[in-house]
């Protein structure tokens, strides 16, 4: 009698085989295979397809082990090596699945994404589909829940999302030539967009290759979508405090693991966002979609009050939005009439903006590099202390290298200063009110026990621009001899100029006030403070300062102004520091870590990445430890988020700092994983 059909108590048969259960998701069918532990994964899939006997392309399918939350992608590995036994339940499922992506402009698109790829690779493929360069700056985020609202039914959530759905077909990752452009920079790249209005220079079929997107409206991703109704804005989640902002950052996906491993389901809605606030090589010729989506992310951050700005700044941002909305409507009609001469003029005008936004260096010839410029002027200085009513005191201040020396008078400047401030590593915050002629600079200077707070008050815009630019450079360890100093001064002056009120508002024609919708241009805080007519008048006054800008220039100016805000580029996390008893905030920016007061957001202490020796994570107790020069050691536990997210932010910024324009190769994925994945 044959023994091969006799089943033993352990589930194995007498001949050494055992039954493996596989669920085929496409057919919703369970299949049982007789296998041994020596059968490799590829052999299991072959047996499965033969047994199914269904004529179908199975090439995209792979085995997924639900219990272990892992893909079995190494087809040469045996079942024994994978640790699979008779009790394992496997799924045979497509690797590419549908995902609903909310873009930075808040619109949804349906995309097919590889659920078995690491998220970093999946985002790179998504960005190729959308023709967005530098995908390393973006990532995927789970949708934050509004804690102030009761749990809603899924149907209610879906109906809200449908109002923001982009029309058009399913977007598939394509293989057209447009996607083969290098991830970093290439001197041989052909301009893809008109630098004047951001529309494609080539026909859409060539622009998007064979992608399904070419069947719809590819230009939609490069065109700003105005907020259509105040009701949509009112329904959206607005963080009420810094702690709410910090909780939003719980949702960042792990870039080193796949979507399936992180429990992302097919057709789930995820947010595609610029994660790292370090934008490299922004170029209007190639980056119309990238610039527009960056502008949209900045716009929504202001409207939803995710970032603070002054009243004058909000009116300036509203005026730029109004201008961009008007020009976006005109773009499709006027694009064919643009001459090459116009594009050349805009190229020249935008060159400074490109340099500023990418953080690069100018090509201007330096002057005498042996002499470092200095500033010397009367400045009012204030050192706030508890239980004191003393105000600003005027000093003769000289700014040399990265230090400010304060003297009681100009005549005493050859002697010993009354105060000396070393600004290397300090926090620099503007406090400006144009109409009130207030031009203050707040400095938080690192000392052994924390931060010393110093305020500088300037007399006028010109003085403020020079001293503010010098302070910003000094905080990074740079002097006024740096080639970016003059450009920084000009950018500050231009930022202030855009906030000026027009002296003669009667010049605004009555007929154009009707197309301004202030409820969709300013944040709710200012809507509550003023009547709609008052806001409209102020927006139109501010619009006269930007009315001559081209579409792309206006978007670039908006991004640049966003970057100038004190809170820009800081990602917050709730943390408990070693030795501390209460919860505080840790802020991560492109160049530093900031310990912050959870209620006020004030910086308690700052540490620069340039002084960092190493950082590591104790995965058992979830503690992040960062070591700096001078034996400084920082340890904290993240209370509301996996410490892996914080670890990835630090490593991600270190990775981005290694980028250079002379690199022609594609992204070094392995280097990114080494810096961010950790020992999980």
Curated annotation (Swiss-Prot):
Ranges for domain PH: 380-476
GO molecular function, one term: phosphatidylinositol-3,4,5-trisphosphate binding
Protein keywords: Cell adhesion, Cell junction, Cell membrane, Cell projection, Cell shape, Cytoplasm, Cytoskeleton, Lipid-binding, Membrane, Nucleus, Phosphoprotein, Wnt signaling pathway
Region ranges (Disordered): 141-162
The keyword Flavoprotein is annotated on this UniProt entry: no
Tissue spec. comment: Detected in adult heart muscle (at protein level). Detected in heart, skeletal muscle and testis.
An individual GO BP term: protein localization to membrane
Region (Interaction with membranes containing phosphatidylinositol phosphate): 40-81
Record comment regarding domains: The FERM domain is not correctly detected by PROSITE or Pfam techniques because it contains the insertion of a PH domain. The PH domain binds phospholipids. Binds preferentially phosphatidylinositol-3,4,5-trisphosphate, and has lower affinity for phosphatidylinositol-4,5-bisphosphate.
Summary of the function given for this chain in its UniProt record: Scaffolding protein that enhances integrin activation mediated by TLN1 and/or TLN2, but activates integrins only weakly by itself. Binds to membranes enriched in phosphoinositides. Enhances integrin-mediated cell adhesion onto the extracellular matrix and cell spreading; this requires both its ability to interact with integrins and with phospholipid membranes. Required for the assembly of focal adhesions. Participates in the connection between extracellular matrix adhesion sites and the actin cytoskeleton and also in the orchestration of actin assembly and cell shape modulation.
Protein name stated in the entry: Fermitin family homolog 2
Organism: Mus musculus (Mouse)
Gene that encodes it: Fermt2
């Amino acid at each position: 009698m044959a023994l091969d059909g006799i089943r033993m108590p352990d589930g194995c048969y007498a001949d050494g085989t055992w039954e493996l259960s596989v669920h085929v998701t496409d057919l919703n069918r369970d299949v049982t295979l007789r296998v041994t532990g020596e059968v490799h994964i590829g052999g299991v899939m072959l047996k499965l397809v033969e047994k199914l006997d269904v004529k179908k392309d199975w090439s995209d399918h792979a085995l997924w082990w639900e219990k272990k939350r892992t893909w079995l992608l190494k087809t040469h590995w045996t079942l024994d090596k994978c640790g699979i036994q008779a009790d394992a339940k496997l799924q045979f499922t497509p690797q590419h699945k549908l995902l609903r992506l909310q873009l930075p402009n808040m619109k949804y698109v349906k995309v097919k994404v590889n659920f078995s790829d690491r998220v970093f690779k999946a985002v790179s493929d998504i960005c190729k589909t959308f023709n967005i360069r530098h995908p390393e700056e973006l990532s995927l985020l789970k949708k934050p829940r509004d804690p102030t609202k009761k749990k809603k039914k899924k149907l209610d959530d879906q109906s809200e999302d449908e109002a923001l759905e982009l029309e058009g077909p399913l977007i598939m990752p394509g293989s057209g030539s447009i996607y083969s452009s290098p991830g970093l920079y290439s001197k041989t790249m052909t301009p893809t967009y008109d630098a004047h209005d951001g529309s494609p220079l080539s026909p859409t079929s060539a622009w998007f290759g064979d992608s399904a997107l070419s069947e719809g409206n590819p230009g939609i991703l490069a065109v700003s979508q105005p907020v259509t109704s105040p009701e949509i804005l009112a329904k959206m989640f607005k963080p009420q405090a810094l702690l709410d902002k910090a909780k939003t950052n719980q949702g960042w996906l792990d870039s080193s693991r796949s979507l399936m491993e992180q429990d992302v389901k097919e057709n789930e809605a995820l947010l595609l966002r610029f994660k790292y606030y370090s934008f490299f090589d922004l170029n209007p010729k190639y980056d119309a979609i990238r610039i527009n989506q960056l502008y949209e992310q900045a716009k929504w951050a202001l409207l939803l009050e995710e970032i603070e700005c002054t009243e004058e700044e909000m009116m300036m941002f509203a005026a730029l939005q109004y201008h961009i909305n008007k020009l976006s409507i005109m773009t499709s009609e006027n694009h064919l009439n643009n001459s090459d001469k116009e594009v050349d003029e805009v190229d020249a005008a935008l060159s400074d903006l490109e340099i500023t936004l990418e953080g690069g260096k100018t090509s201007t010839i330096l002057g005498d590099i042996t002499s470092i410029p200095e500033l010397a002027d009367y400045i009012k200085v204030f050192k706030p202390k508890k239980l004191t009513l003393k105000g600003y005191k005027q000093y003769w201040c000289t700014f040399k290298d990265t230090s400010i020396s304060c003297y009681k008078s100009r005549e005493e400047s050859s002697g010993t200063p009354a105060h000396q401030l070393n600004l290397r590593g300090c926090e620099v915050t503007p406090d400006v009110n144009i109409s009130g002629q207030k031009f203050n600079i707040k400095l938080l200077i690192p000392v052994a026990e924390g931060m010393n707070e110093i305020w500088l008050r300037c007399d006028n815009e010109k003085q403020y621009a020079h001293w503010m630019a010098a302070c910003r450079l000094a905080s990074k360890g740079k002097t006024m001899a740096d080639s970016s100093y003059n450009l920084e001064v000009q950018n500050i002056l231009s930022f202030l100029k855009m906030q000026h009120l027009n002296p003669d508002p009667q010049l605004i024609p009555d007929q154009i006030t009707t197309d301004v919708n202030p409820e969709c241009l300013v944040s709710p805080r200012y809507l509550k403070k003023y009547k709609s007519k008052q806001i409209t008048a102020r927006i139109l006054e501010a619009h006269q300062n930007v009315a001559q800008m081209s579409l792309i220039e206006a978007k670039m100016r908006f991004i640049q102004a966003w970057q100038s805000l004190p809170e820009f580029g800081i990602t917050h996390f709730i943390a408990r520091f070693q030795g501390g008893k209460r919860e505080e905030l840790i802020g991560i920016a492109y160049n530093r870590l900031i310990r912050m007061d959870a209620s006020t957001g004030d910086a308690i202490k700052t540490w620069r990445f340039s002084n960092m020796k190493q950082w590591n994570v104790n995965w058992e107790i979830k503690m992040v430890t960062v070591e700096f020069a001078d034996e400084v050691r920082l340890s904290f536990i993240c209370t509301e988020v996996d410490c892996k997210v914080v670890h990835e932010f630090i490593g991600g910024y270190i990775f981005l700092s290694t980028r250079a324009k002379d690199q022609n190769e594609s992204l070094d994925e392995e280097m990114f994983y080494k810096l961010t994945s950790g020992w999980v």
